[in-house]
Protein backbone atom coordinates (compact mmCIF):
# COMPACT_ATOMS: atom_id res chain seq x y z
CA UNK A 1 0.00 0.00 0.00
CA UNK A 2 2.76 2.42 0.89
CA UNK A 3 4.53 1.72 -2.42
CA UNK A 4 1.33 2.37 -4.36
CA UNK A 5 0.68 5.62 -2.49
CA UNK A 6 4.25 6.79 -3.15
CA UNK A 7 3.89 5.97 -6.85
CA UNK A 8 0.59 7.86 -6.98
CA UNK A 9 2.19 10.90 -5.34
CA UNK A 10 5.07 10.81 -7.84
CA UNK A 11 2.63 10.62 -10.77
CA UNK A 12 0.67 13.57 -9.38
CA UNK A 13 3.82 15.63 -8.98
CA UNK A 14 4.88 14.89 -12.58
CA UNK A 15 1.49 16.06 -13.82
CA UNK A 16 1.76 19.22 -11.75
CA UNK A 17 5.17 19.85 -13.21
CA UNK A 18 3.78 19.48 -16.74
CA UNK A 19 0.91 21.87 -16.07
CA UNK A 20 2.94 24.45 -14.15
CA UNK A 21 6.01 24.38 -16.39
CA UNK A 22 5.22 27.80 -17.85
CA UNK A 23 4.45 30.80 -15.63
CA UNK A 24 1.99 32.31 -18.17
CA UNK A 25 -0.44 29.41 -18.23
CA UNK A 26 -4.05 30.28 -17.42
CA UNK A 27 -5.12 27.95 -14.64
CA UNK A 28 -8.85 28.40 -15.30
CA UNK A 29 -8.47 27.37 -18.95
CA UNK A 30 -6.30 24.45 -17.88
CA UNK A 31 -8.90 23.34 -15.35
CA UNK A 32 -11.64 23.66 -17.95
CA UNK A 33 -9.60 21.55 -20.37
CA UNK A 34 -8.96 18.97 -17.66
CA UNK A 35 -12.70 18.80 -16.88
CA UNK A 36 -13.60 18.24 -20.53
CA UNK A 37 -15.19 14.87 -21.45
CA UNK A 38 -12.78 14.20 -24.32
CA UNK A 39 -9.72 14.29 -22.02
CA UNK A 40 -11.28 12.37 -19.12
CA UNK A 41 -12.31 9.53 -21.42
CA UNK A 42 -8.70 8.96 -22.55
CA UNK A 43 -7.07 9.29 -19.11
CA UNK A 44 -6.90 6.55 -16.50
CA UNK A 45 -8.69 6.57 -13.19
CA UNK A 46 -5.56 7.44 -11.25
CA UNK A 47 -4.90 10.53 -13.31
CA UNK A 48 -8.50 11.68 -12.85
CA UNK A 49 -8.23 11.25 -9.08
CA UNK A 50 -4.99 13.18 -8.91
CA UNK A 51 -6.46 15.96 -11.00
CA UNK A 52 -9.39 16.21 -8.67
CA UNK A 53 -7.02 16.35 -5.70
CA UNK A 54 -5.03 19.06 -7.45
CA UNK A 55 -8.19 21.08 -8.09
CA UNK A 56 -9.15 20.88 -4.42
CA UNK A 57 -5.68 21.84 -3.26
CA UNK A 58 -5.43 24.69 -5.75
CA UNK A 59 -8.80 26.16 -4.76
CA UNK A 60 -8.01 25.96 -1.06
CA UNK A 61 -4.56 27.50 -1.46
CA UNK A 62 -5.40 30.18 -4.03
CA UNK A 63 -8.57 31.69 -2.61
CA UNK A 64 -9.20 30.71 1.01
CA UNK A 65 -5.62 30.48 2.37
CA UNK A 66 -4.12 33.66 0.92
CA UNK A 67 -3.22 34.86 4.42
CA UNK A 68 -0.81 31.94 4.91
CA UNK A 69 1.14 32.80 1.73
CA UNK A 70 3.98 35.31 1.82
CA UNK A 71 4.03 38.67 0.07
CA UNK A 72 6.45 37.41 -2.59
CA UNK A 73 4.25 34.48 -3.59
CA UNK A 74 1.01 36.58 -3.78
CA UNK A 75 2.31 38.73 -6.64
CA UNK A 76 3.62 35.79 -8.62
CA UNK A 77 1.77 32.92 -10.16
CA UNK A 78 1.74 29.67 -8.23
CA UNK A 79 4.39 27.26 -9.58
CA UNK A 80 5.62 23.78 -8.66
CA UNK A 81 8.54 25.16 -6.66
CA UNK A 82 6.30 27.36 -4.52
CA UNK A 83 3.91 24.50 -3.91
CA UNK A 84 6.76 22.20 -2.86
CA UNK A 85 8.24 24.84 -0.54
CA UNK A 86 4.92 25.16 1.30
CA UNK A 87 4.06 22.92 4.23
CA UNK A 88 2.44 19.61 3.51
CA UNK A 89 -0.47 20.47 5.82
CA UNK A 90 -1.46 23.38 3.57
CA UNK A 91 -1.44 21.35 0.36
CA UNK A 92 -2.62 17.96 1.57
CA UNK A 93 -4.76 17.92 4.71
CA UNK A 94 -4.63 14.27 5.71
CA UNK A 95 -4.82 12.82 9.16
CA UNK A 96 -2.50 9.97 8.17
CA UNK A 97 0.45 12.39 8.13
CA UNK A 98 -0.05 13.27 11.76
CA UNK A 99 -0.37 9.58 12.65
CA UNK A 100 2.92 8.84 10.88
CA UNK A 101 4.63 11.67 12.77
CA UNK A 102 3.36 10.34 16.10
CA UNK A 103 4.52 6.85 15.24
CA UNK A 104 7.94 8.10 14.15
CA UNK A 105 8.34 10.10 17.38
CA UNK A 106 7.40 7.05 19.45
CA UNK A 107 9.86 4.91 17.52
CA UNK A 108 12.58 7.48 18.10
CA UNK A 109 11.89 7.48 21.83
CA UNK A 110 11.98 3.69 21.91
CA UNK A 111 15.21 3.63 19.90
CA UNK A 112 16.81 6.15 22.25
CA UNK A 113 15.83 4.05 25.27
CA UNK A 114 17.13 0.87 23.63
CA UNK A 115 20.37 2.64 22.69
CA UNK A 116 20.93 3.71 26.30
CA UNK A 117 20.27 0.17 27.48
CA UNK A 118 22.70 -1.30 24.95
CA UNK A 119 25.39 1.23 25.91
CA UNK A 120 24.97 0.39 29.59
CA UNK A 121 25.15 -3.35 28.84
CA UNK A 122 28.25 -2.88 26.69
CA UNK A 123 29.99 -0.87 29.40
CA UNK A 124 29.22 -3.51 32.04
CA UNK A 125 30.41 -6.30 29.71
CA UNK A 126 33.65 -4.44 28.97
CA UNK A 127 34.30 -3.95 32.70
CA UNK A 128 33.69 -7.64 33.37
CA UNK A 129 36.02 -8.62 30.53
CA UNK A 130 38.76 -6.32 31.80
CA UNK A 131 38.44 -7.76 35.31
CA UNK A 132 38.59 -11.34 33.99
CA UNK A 133 41.62 -10.49 31.82
CA UNK A 134 43.43 -8.98 34.80
CA UNK A 135 42.70 -12.05 36.92
CA UNK A 136 43.94 -14.39 34.17
CA UNK A 137 47.12 -12.31 33.72
CA UNK A 138 47.82 -12.40 37.46
CA UNK A 139 47.34 -16.18 37.56
CA UNK A 140 49.62 -16.64 34.55
CA UNK A 141 52.33 -14.46 36.11
CA UNK A 142 52.13 -16.38 39.38
CA UNK A 143 52.39 -19.72 37.56
CA UNK A 144 55.39 -18.49 35.55
CA UNK A 145 57.18 -17.24 38.65
CA UNK A 146 56.70 -20.55 40.44
CA UNK A 147 57.94 -22.68 37.50
CA UNK A 148 61.60 -23.71 37.19
CA UNK A 149 63.58 -22.21 34.33
CA UNK A 150 64.87 -24.90 31.97
CA UNK A 151 66.42 -24.89 28.54
CA UNK A 152 64.43 -26.11 25.51
CA UNK A 153 64.58 -29.87 25.13
CA UNK A 154 64.35 -29.57 21.34
CA UNK A 155 68.06 -28.66 21.25
CA UNK A 156 69.05 -31.71 23.29
CA UNK A 157 70.82 -34.46 21.30
CA UNK A 158 69.53 -37.89 20.49
CA UNK A 159 70.56 -40.95 22.56
CA UNK A 160 73.07 -41.90 19.84
CA UNK A 161 74.96 -38.58 20.05
CA UNK A 162 78.02 -37.64 22.10
CA UNK A 163 76.03 -35.79 24.73
CA UNK A 164 74.27 -38.94 25.91
CA UNK A 165 77.61 -40.78 26.12
CA UNK A 166 79.07 -37.99 28.25
CA UNK A 167 76.00 -38.07 30.47
CA UNK A 168 76.43 -41.83 30.90
CA UNK A 169 80.07 -41.29 31.89
CA UNK A 170 79.14 -38.74 34.54
CA UNK A 171 76.46 -41.03 35.90
CA UNK A 172 78.92 -43.96 36.05
CA UNK A 173 81.42 -41.81 37.94
CA UNK A 174 78.77 -40.75 40.43
CA UNK A 175 77.76 -44.39 40.96
CA UNK A 176 81.41 -45.38 41.45
CA UNK A 177 81.75 -42.84 44.27
CA UNK A 178 79.07 -44.63 46.28
CA UNK A 179 80.69 -48.08 45.95
CA UNK A 180 82.48 -49.58 49.01
CA UNK A 181 86.26 -49.37 49.37
CA UNK A 182 86.86 -53.09 49.98
CA UNK A 183 89.88 -54.09 47.88
CA UNK A 184 89.75 -57.33 46.02
CA UNK A 185 92.11 -60.08 47.17
CA UNK A 186 94.74 -61.18 44.67
CA UNK A 187 94.19 -64.63 43.23
CA UNK A 188 96.94 -67.18 43.74
CA UNK A 189 98.12 -68.45 40.42
CA UNK A 190 98.83 -72.24 40.36
CA UNK A 191 102.21 -73.34 39.17
CA UNK A 192 102.43 -74.64 35.66
CA UNK A 193 103.11 -78.33 35.23
CA UNK A 194 106.44 -79.05 33.60
CA UNK A 195 106.40 -81.29 30.56
CA UNK A 196 108.62 -84.31 30.81
CA UNK A 197 107.35 -86.27 27.86
CA UNK A 198 105.37 -85.27 24.83
CA UNK A 199 102.85 -88.01 25.60
CA UNK A 200 101.77 -86.40 28.91
CA UNK A 201 99.82 -83.52 27.21
CA UNK A 202 96.48 -85.12 27.98
CA UNK A 203 97.16 -85.06 31.74
CA UNK A 204 97.90 -81.29 31.82
CA UNK A 205 95.11 -79.10 33.23
CA UNK A 206 94.84 -75.80 31.37
CA UNK A 207 93.77 -72.95 33.67
CA UNK A 208 91.69 -69.99 32.50
CA UNK A 209 94.35 -67.55 33.54
CA UNK A 210 96.75 -69.12 31.05
CA UNK A 211 94.41 -68.14 28.19
CA UNK A 212 95.32 -64.71 26.72
CA UNK A 213 91.66 -63.54 26.50
CA UNK A 214 91.08 -64.35 30.16
CA UNK A 215 94.26 -62.46 31.09
CA UNK A 216 93.00 -59.38 29.25
CA UNK A 217 89.70 -59.51 31.12
CA UNK A 218 91.48 -59.79 34.47
CA UNK A 219 93.72 -56.84 33.61
CA UNK A 220 90.71 -54.69 32.69
CA UNK A 221 88.95 -55.60 35.93
CA UNK A 222 92.09 -54.66 37.91
CA UNK A 223 92.29 -51.30 36.14
CA UNK A 224 88.63 -50.63 36.96
CA UNK A 225 89.25 -51.51 40.62
CA UNK A 226 92.17 -49.10 40.77
CA UNK A 227 90.01 -46.34 39.28
CA UNK A 228 87.30 -46.99 41.87
CA UNK A 229 89.89 -46.83 44.67
CA UNK A 230 91.16 -43.49 43.44
CA UNK A 231 87.65 -42.00 43.36
CA UNK A 232 87.04 -41.79 47.12
CA UNK A 233 85.05 -39.19 49.11
CA UNK A 234 88.27 -37.74 50.57
CA UNK A 235 89.79 -37.03 47.17
CA UNK A 236 86.54 -35.98 45.44
CA UNK A 237 87.16 -32.25 45.99
CA UNK A 238 90.64 -32.45 44.45
CA UNK A 239 89.25 -34.43 41.55
CA UNK A 240 86.55 -31.80 40.93
CA UNK A 241 89.19 -29.08 40.96
CA UNK A 242 91.36 -30.81 38.39
CA UNK A 243 88.65 -32.25 36.11
CA UNK A 244 85.91 -29.99 34.74
CA UNK A 245 82.47 -31.52 34.68
CA UNK A 246 80.80 -31.46 31.31
CA UNK A 247 77.41 -29.71 31.22
CA UNK A 248 74.31 -31.83 31.66
CA UNK A 249 71.92 -32.14 28.76
CA UNK A 250 69.10 -30.17 30.43
CA UNK A 251 71.18 -27.12 31.48
CA UNK A 252 71.53 -23.77 29.76
CA UNK A 253 75.31 -24.24 29.37
CA UNK A 254 74.69 -27.23 27.14
CA UNK A 255 72.30 -25.24 24.95
CA UNK A 256 74.85 -22.42 24.67
CA UNK A 257 77.54 -24.88 23.63
CA UNK A 258 75.16 -26.39 21.10
CA UNK A 259 74.40 -22.95 19.68
CA UNK A 260 78.13 -22.26 19.34
CA UNK A 261 78.58 -25.55 17.51
CA UNK A 262 75.71 -24.71 15.20
CA UNK A 263 77.28 -21.31 14.45
CA UNK A 264 80.57 -22.98 13.59
CA UNK A 265 78.80 -25.44 11.34
CA UNK A 266 76.93 -22.62 9.61
CA UNK A 267 80.19 -20.73 9.07
CA UNK A 268 81.88 -23.85 7.71
CA UNK A 269 78.97 -24.54 5.38
CA UNK A 270 79.10 -20.92 4.19
CA UNK A 271 82.81 -21.27 3.47
CA UNK A 272 82.14 -24.48 1.57
CA UNK A 273 79.49 -22.74 -0.49
CA UNK A 274 81.91 -19.92 -1.30
CA UNK A 275 84.59 -22.41 -2.31
CA UNK A 276 82.05 -24.23 -4.43
CA UNK A 277 81.09 -20.99 -6.18
CA UNK A 278 84.76 -20.19 -6.85
CA UNK A 279 85.34 -23.68 -8.25
CA UNK A 280 82.24 -23.34 -10.39
CA UNK A 281 83.46 -20.02 -11.82
CA UNK A 282 86.89 -21.46 -12.55
CA UNK A 283 85.29 -24.46 -14.22
CA UNK A 284 83.18 -22.15 -16.41
CA UNK A 285 86.27 -20.16 -17.40
CA UNK A 286 88.16 -23.36 -18.19
CA UNK A 287 85.26 -24.51 -20.36
CA UNK A 288 85.31 -21.21 -22.26
CA UNK A 289 89.07 -21.44 -22.79
CA UNK A 290 88.74 -25.05 -23.93
CA UNK A 291 86.10 -24.02 -26.45
CA UNK A 292 88.34 -21.26 -27.78
CA UNK A 293 91.28 -23.64 -28.07
CA UNK A 294 89.09 -26.15 -29.93
CA UNK A 295 88.01 -23.48 -32.41
CA UNK A 296 91.65 -22.38 -32.86
CA UNK A 297 92.66 -26.00 -33.46
CA UNK A 298 89.96 -26.37 -36.12
CA UNK A 299 91.14 -23.20 -37.82
CA UNK A 300 94.73 -24.44 -37.76
CA UNK A 301 93.64 -27.75 -39.30
CA UNK A 302 91.86 -25.90 -42.10
CA UNK A 303 94.92 -23.71 -42.71
CA UNK A 304 97.11 -26.82 -42.74
CA UNK A 305 94.88 -28.41 -45.38
CA UNK A 306 95.18 -25.29 -47.56
CA UNK A 307 98.95 -25.35 -47.19
CA UNK A 308 99.06 -29.02 -48.21
CA UNK A 309 97.11 -28.24 -51.38
CA UNK A 310 99.42 -25.35 -52.24
CA UNK A 311 102.45 -27.57 -51.65
CA UNK A 312 101.11 -30.18 -54.06
CA UNK A 313 100.46 -27.54 -56.74
CA UNK A 314 103.96 -26.16 -56.31
CA UNK A 315 105.41 -29.64 -56.64
CA UNK A 316 103.56 -30.15 -59.91
CA UNK A 317 104.81 -26.83 -61.25
CA UNK A 318 108.36 -27.72 -60.24
CA UNK A 319 108.14 -31.06 -62.04
CA UNK A 320 106.89 -29.34 -65.18
CA UNK A 321 109.74 -26.85 -65.06
CA UNK A 322 112.25 -29.63 -64.55
CA UNK A 323 110.90 -31.52 -67.55
CA UNK A 324 111.01 -28.38 -69.67
CA UNK A 325 114.60 -27.69 -68.65
CA UNK A 326 115.70 -31.28 -69.39
CA UNK A 327 114.07 -31.09 -72.85
CA UNK A 328 115.95 -27.93 -73.65
CA UNK A 329 119.25 -29.44 -72.53
CA UNK A 330 118.73 -32.51 -74.73
CA UNK A 331 117.90 -30.32 -77.68
CA UNK A 332 121.02 -28.25 -77.16
CA UNK A 333 123.19 -31.38 -76.88
CA UNK A 334 121.91 -32.68 -80.27
CA UNK A 335 122.40 -29.34 -82.03
CA UNK A 336 126.11 -29.03 -81.06
CA UNK A 337 127.42 -32.11 -83.00
CA UNK A 338 125.41 -31.10 -86.11
CA UNK A 339 127.07 -27.69 -86.14
CA UNK A 340 130.51 -29.32 -85.86
CA UNK A 341 129.80 -31.60 -88.84
CA UNK A 342 128.71 -28.66 -90.98
CA UNK A 343 131.87 -26.74 -90.08
CA UNK A 344 134.07 -29.66 -91.06
CA UNK A 345 132.33 -30.05 -94.41
CA UNK A 346 132.76 -26.36 -95.14
CA UNK A 347 136.48 -26.51 -94.34
CA UNK A 348 137.00 -29.46 -96.59
Swiss-Prot record:
UniProt feature coiled coil, ranges: none
Nucleus is among the record's keywords: yes
Cellular component terms (Gene Ontology): cytoplasm; nucleus
Start-end of Basic and acidic residues biased regions: 124-135
Keywords of the record: Cytoplasm, Nucleus
Composition skew (Polar residues), residue ranges: 332-342
Location in or out of the cell: Cytoplasm; Nucleus
Chain spans, region Disordered: 101-135, 148-167, 319-348
Low complexity: compositionally biased ranges: 149-161
Function: Involved in cation homeostasis and in the regulation of the cation stress signaling cascades.
Stated name of the protein: Protein ATC1/LIC4
Organism: Candida glabrata (strain ATCC 2001 / BCRC 20586 / JCM 3761 / NBRC 0622 / NRRL Y-65 / CBS 138)
Amino acid sequence: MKAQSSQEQEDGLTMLHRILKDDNVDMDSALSDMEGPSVNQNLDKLEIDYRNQFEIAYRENSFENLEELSDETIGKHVTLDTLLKMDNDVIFKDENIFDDEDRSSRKRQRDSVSDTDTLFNEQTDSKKRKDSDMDSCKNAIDSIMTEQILSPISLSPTPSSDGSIQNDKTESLEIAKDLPKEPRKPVDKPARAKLKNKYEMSNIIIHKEDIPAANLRNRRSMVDNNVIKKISPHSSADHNKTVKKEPVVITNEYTVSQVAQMKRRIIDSHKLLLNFNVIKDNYARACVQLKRSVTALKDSEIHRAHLILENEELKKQLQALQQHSTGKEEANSTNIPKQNILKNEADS
